[in-house]
Every structure is written in C-alpha cells, then in structure tokens.
Amino acid sequence: MKHIEVVAAVIVRDGRYFATQRGYGEYKDKWEFPGGKVEPGESREEALIREIREELATTIGIDRFICTVDCDYPDFHLTMHCYLCHVVSGHLQLLEAEDARWLDGSHLHTVDWLPADKEVVTNLMHTGFLTFRRDDNVSDPETVSRR
C-alpha cells in the first residue's frame, strides 16, 4: 500500500481552530486542518510553513507538536504530523480550499472531517489543547479571503 507523509497546522486564535474544506479530488467537500506533503530533504516544520504559505498566503509560527496520526484510506496509508500554530502575518487567503471556518471546541464536530483529521479533533478534545489561547499583535486572521 502506498504511504504518504504529511504535516498539518492546527491554527488557533482566541480559542478557535481554523479548518479548511477541500475543493478538489476524491475527498472534495471534506474538512481538514491545512497542510500538505513533506518534500525530500525538508523538515516537517519547513514543510508546514511552506505548505501554509502556498495554500493560504500566510506565514505561521509553530508553537508545539501535538500528535502523529496513522490512518488507512482505501488506496493509501497516511501518516500526519500535527502542530499547534498561530498566524504571524497574512490574511488566510483560500488559494486551494473551497471554504474555511473558525471553530470553537464545542463546534469541532459540526463539520465532516477527513478520517485522519477526525482523530486529531478527538486528540485535541482529550489533551486539553482546546483551552490554548494565544494573544498576538498580528493582522486579524478572522477574515478569510477567497481568491
């Protein structure tokens, strides 16, 4: 079975989590934490910063590692490394995603997550990361712009 290694940014602002909705492929309309594949010679952190810049035109800071999720899909095995992050600069422009939402802890289960991301949500609820808050003096990431 094909193995894919990816990284995901759990971007938090004022106790809410940023989720994106896929606009393409077999899993179109499913929700996920933004991120992508780790390229050869790239660290996980470098990959995450690059992917968020490419997908959302935003620079993030990585606060801490959260978890690694292994998940079997019909055609591949996914290993996803997740990091708690914050916006450093940018306005979270949706360059690839169909939609995005800021979800507080009580609303994390209101969207149709991809299987691996669903495991991350469960992990967030059980580890106490739902209470994590960061007060930054950065441009307001509340506004999500569409390309």
What are these regions (language model features)?
Residues 1-17, 37:
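Conserved N-terminal beta-strand and adjoining loop/helix that marks the start
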Residues 59, 69-91, 99-101, 122-124:
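Active-site-adjacent beta-strand/loop module that shapes the phosphate/pyrophosphate-binding cleft
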Residues 26, 31, 93-147:
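Nudix hydrolase/Nudix homology domain
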Residues 19-21:
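Beta-strand scaffold of nucleotide-dependent catalytic cores
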Residues 33-65, 104:
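The catalytic Nudix box helix
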